């Protein structure tokens, strides 16, 4: 089992042929590798595990059923 957190991509950029994005987790923003989710772009939501976006998700999945 692993822990992943949902976040929203707010910026995309490339460093040394790696695709990265600034991902917002509420008020906190962190750089995240986006290479594993090539279909995710600014405005999309992803699940992040140890600095890597591992899954492209919907806004409903990101906010949960109670939001």
Predicted regions and their residues:
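Short, conserved beta-turn/loop elements at beta-strand boundaries and strand-helix junctions
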Residues: 12-17
């Amino acid at each position: 089992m692993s822990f992943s957190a949902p976040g929203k991509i707010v910026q995309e950029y490339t460093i040394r042929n790696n695709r990265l994005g600034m991902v917002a987790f509420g008020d906190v923003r962190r750089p995240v590798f986006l290479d594993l989710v090539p279909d995710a772009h600014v405005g999309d939501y992803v699940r992040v595990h140890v600095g890597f976006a591992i899954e492209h998700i919907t806004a409903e999945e990101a906010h949960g059923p109670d939001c």
